[in-house]
Amino acid sequence: MLEHILTLSAFLFCIGVFGLITSRNMVRALMCLELIFNAVNINLVAFSNFLDSSQIKGEIFSIFIIAIAAAEATIGLAIVLAIYRNRKSTRIDQFNLLKW
Amino acid sequence: MFLLQKYDYFFVFLLIISFFSILIFSLSKWIAPINKGPEKFTSYESGIEPMGEACIQFQIRYYMFALVFVIFDVETVFLYPWAMSFYNFGISSFIEALIFILILIIGLVYAWRKGALEWS
Amino acid sequence: MKLELDMFFLYGSTILPECILIFSLLIILIIDLTFPKKDTIWLYFISLTSLLISIIILLFQYKTDPIISFLGSFQTDSFNRIFQSFIVFCSILCIPLSIEYIKCAKMAIPEFLIFILTATVGGMFLCGANDLVTIFVSLECLSLCSYLLCGYTKRDIRSNEAAIKYLLIGGTSSSILAYGFSWLYGLSGGETNIQKITNGLLNAETYNSSGTFIAFICILVGLAFKLSLVPFHQWTPDIYEGSPTPVVAFLSVTSKIAGLALATRILNILFSFSPNEWKIFLEILAILSMILGNLVAITQTSMKRMLAYSSISQIGYILIGLITGDLKGYTSMTIYVFFYIFMNLGTFACIILYSLRTGTDNIRDYAGLYIKDPLLSFSLTLCLLSLGGLPPLTGFFGKLYLFWCGWQSGFYLLVFIALITSVISLYYYLKIIKLILTKKNNEINPYIQAYIITSPTFFSKNPIEFVMIFCVLGSTFLGIIINPIFSFFQDSLSLSVFFIK
């Protein structure tokens, strides 16, 4: 049973990384970031259910990860808002000011 | 299917449900009369005349409220474990939770004073 | 399990410096909210005072035996104390650097100070974190503040772009790190304390499994992103170029120091069962970053980008001490970090001063600066030469100790490449210095012409110049007294948790 959950979280992780690499829109990239964090959460909750059911440290850890992911998403969206105000677009591939 | 013995019922239900949904949709397609007209293509807004386009831009205000909401919504999650084990910890944890809420309140006051909660 | 939540009164002294900073940032926030009239001198005063108090407390307590507090989630020893005081020291130097820049860019001051203080607190907690949860939370506390600081000039598109790039890449790296943490949590049988994880891995005999290897790779990738080692360095030049310059000065030292402390703790305590494995990986990363950082830095045209690549190569040198792994190696690493603060902040102080007066960062616009401002060009020259490691200056002695320790421990290839690349680095530093000092007749570029000459009196100098002169003095003369410094750091590091077994 544990293997299935771990496989699920590994798939979610891979989808998240793939999406981060390929997505053109910034909001979509932020969503992929959330996917990776959710993969971590699934892993932690599964492990804490199977191995550590008395102290449930993993679930506490996942609460912290949820809170921090929310803060990160909020900061990301705020920066997206600032970018949108300045250049009326949120596409990643149009960010080419900083290059060598 | 051999690995997940507990899920046999689930798969039976899944089969039945998918069978029923296909059956019902094909029945309605077979029975219902087919009309074509301009009314068919308008969006459905609870029976009222639709106003404007389906893809409208939301006010940017909603966005600001959503940003503030997300932060405070998630921070309250930390209070649930504390509340569940309140009787085990005694008065000191109560004071610590008060400090935590106080910091959140300072954040809320900050958002308020900086005008993130103003609509106009 | 009975929880002792009033342990704060027992262990309060272990996090007292951090508590002072948190308290002062709350005070700054409340002052900003209650008084609409902006009296900014007070805000600077409060932040600098709290930083000073906390560094004094840290210096008084620097020789402590390892104490584990807060249910095993925080550990205090002399190694952490030294790195924490480095971080506070950087913040003390960086706040005067940013005063005039903020005034010119018309940014809000209280938020800037709050972000700087929060990042400092996050870095300080990161140095002593002993628990996976604490490591993750304090790491994010540091990096979330850094994203906000990068995008602090909201109207500037380049700053926005740097912020979003930093956010995406930093978020990716910390999520990969968290994925590695989740595997460690599972493989050790449900432990989050890093000493208990090692015991759990040894007891469950999973320390050689492929799962541990995946966790190790994930954690190493996350750390390498934070330290900007070479295959994971792509974000550094972009962020250095786009962000406001005082913020870059702050990030280039603080996040490096905190990341280095974290890497040392994780690799030494968590992966203490396979030291040869991580040393090989780190060696490859260090060699790559020394070679690529120095080679790419030659071709740069922007000063900030050049410094970004040079910082990538510097972190490669610093890693030699970590790879060496004995007391002398750690001591020389700590000393080099200490010198690096002076050299790097001194260089950045010069750049901030120049860009405030002319508004450009290009290297070629520095041509002929010597005619207009000898003080600035002299200090820039000294800092750059010290970064390159020319003999009588501080950077030379730091590098000498690092390379000598590496050579004695038998890392010949590493030290050999480090020697060659530091010669290459001298080339591009000298190129800039030649540009500054040589005078092309009748062809002064417009930026230099627009340069405002400062008043020669001593008291009318601005805070940036004070910091600049202080750092230049440090990066010139500290090398002479390296022997007492070395024995001082060696004494205190020998009390740290890595050497008390």
From Swiss-Prot, chain A:
Membrane-topology descriptor: Multi-pass membrane protein
Record-linked InterPro entries: NADH_UbQ_OxRdtase_chain4L/K, NUOK/Mnh_C1-like
Membrane-spanning segments: 1-21, 30-50, 63-83
Keywords from the named record: Chloroplast, Membrane, NAD, NADP, Plastid, Plastoquinone, Quinone, Thylakoid, Translocase, Transmembrane, Transmembrane helix, Transport
Biological processes per GO annotation: ATP synthesis coupled electron transport; photosynthesis, light reaction
Record has ATP-binding as a keyword: no
Catalytically driven reaction(s): a plastoquinone + NADH + (n+1) H(+)(in) = a plastoquinol + NAD(+) + n H(+)(out); a plastoquinone + NADPH + (n+1) H(+)(in) = a plastoquinol + NADP(+) + n H(+)(out)
GO MF term (any one): oxidoreductase activity, acting on NAD(P)H, quinone or similar compound as acceptor
Enzyme class, spelled out: translocase
Subunit structure: NDH is composed of at least 16 different subunits, 5 of which are encoded in the nucleus.
Role of this protein: NDH shuttles electrons from NAD(P)H:plastoquinone, via FMN and iron-sulfur (Fe-S) centers, to quinones in the photosynthetic chain and possibly in a chloroplast respiratory chain. The immediate electron acceptor for the enzyme in this species is believed to be plastoquinone. Couples the redox reaction to proton translocation, and thus conserves the redox energy in a proton gradient.
Family per similarity comment: Belongs to the complex I subunit 4L family.
Record protein name field: NAD(P)H-quinone oxidoreductase subunit 4L, chloroplastic
The species this protein was found in: Marchantia polymorpha (Common liverwort)
The organism's taxonomic lineage, starting at the top: Eukaryota, Viridiplantae, Streptophyta, Embryophyta, Marchantiophyta
Gene transcribed to yield this protein: ndhE
Swiss-Prot record, chain B:
Pfam families: Oxidored_q4
Topology in membrane: Multi-pass membrane protein
Enzyme Commission number(s) from the entry: 7.1.1.-
UniProt keyword annotations, A-Z: Chloroplast, Membrane, NAD, NADP, Plastid, Plastoquinone, Quinone, Thylakoid, Translocase, Transmembrane, Transmembrane helix, Transport
GO MF assignments: NADH dehydrogenase (ubiquinone) activity; quinone binding
Gene3D superfamilies (alphabetical): NADH:ubiquinone/plastoquinone oxidoreductase, chain 3
An annotated GO cellular component: chloroplast thylakoid membrane
Membrane-spanning segments: 7-27, 64-84, 89-109
Domain of life: Eukaryota
Enzyme class at the top of the EC tree: translocase
Plastid keyword on record: yes
Keyword Ribosomal protein tagged: no
Localization, UniProt: Plastid, Chloroplast thylakoid membrane
BP-aspect Gene Ontology terms: photosynthesis, light reaction
Catalytic activity: a plastoquinone + NADH + (n+1) H(+)(in) = a plastoquinol + NAD(+) + n H(+)(out); a plastoquinone + NADPH + (n+1) H(+)(in) = a plastoquinol + NADP(+) + n H(+)(out)
Subunit structure: NDH is composed of at least 16 different subunits, 5 of which are encoded in the nucleus.
Protein role: NDH shuttles electrons from NAD(P)H:plastoquinone, via FMN and iron-sulfur (Fe-S) centers, to quinones in the photosynthetic chain and possibly in a chloroplast respiratory chain. The immediate electron acceptor for the enzyme in this species is believed to be plastoquinone. Couples the redox reaction to proton translocation, and thus conserves the redox energy in a proton gradient.
Family to which this protein belongs: Belongs to the complex I subunit 3 family.
Entry protein name: NAD(P)H-quinone oxidoreductase subunit 3, chloroplastic
Native source species: Marchantia polymorpha (Common liverwort)
Originating gene: ndhC
UniProtKB/Swiss-Prot annotation, chain C:
Membrane topology: Multi-pass membrane protein
GO BP term, pick one: ATP synthesis coupled electron transport
Pfam family, one: Ndh2_N
Principal place of residence: plastid
GO CC term, one of those recorded: chloroplast thylakoid membrane
Catalyzed reactions: a plastoquinone + NADH + (n+1) H(+)(in) = a plastoquinol + NAD(+) + n H(+)(out); a plastoquinone + NADPH + (n+1) H(+)(in) = a plastoquinol + NADP(+) + n H(+)(out)
Compartments where found: Plastid, Chloroplast thylakoid membrane
Key words, A-Z: Chloroplast, Membrane, NAD, NADP, Plastid, Plastoquinone, Quinone, Thylakoid, Translocase, Transmembrane, Transmembrane helix, Transport
GO molecular function: NADH dehydrogenase (ubiquinone) activity; quinone binding
EC number: 7.1.1.-
InterPro entries: NADH-Q_OxRdtase_suN/2, ND/Mrp_TM, Ndh2_N
Transmembrane annotation, as ranges: 15-35, 40-60, 82-102, 107-127, 132-152, 167-187, 212-232, 244-264, 278-298, 307-327, 333-353, 378-398, 410-430, 466-486
Family assignment from sequence similarity: Belongs to the complex I subunit 2 family.
Reported function: NDH shuttles electrons from NAD(P)H:plastoquinone, via FMN and iron-sulfur (Fe-S) centers, to quinones in the photosynthetic chain and possibly in a chloroplast respiratory chain. The immediate electron acceptor for the enzyme in this species is believed to be plastoquinone. Couples the redox reaction to proton translocation, and thus conserves the redox energy in a proton gradient.
Name assigned to this protein: NAD(P)H-quinone oxidoreductase subunit 2, chloroplastic
Organism the protein comes from: Marchantia polymorpha
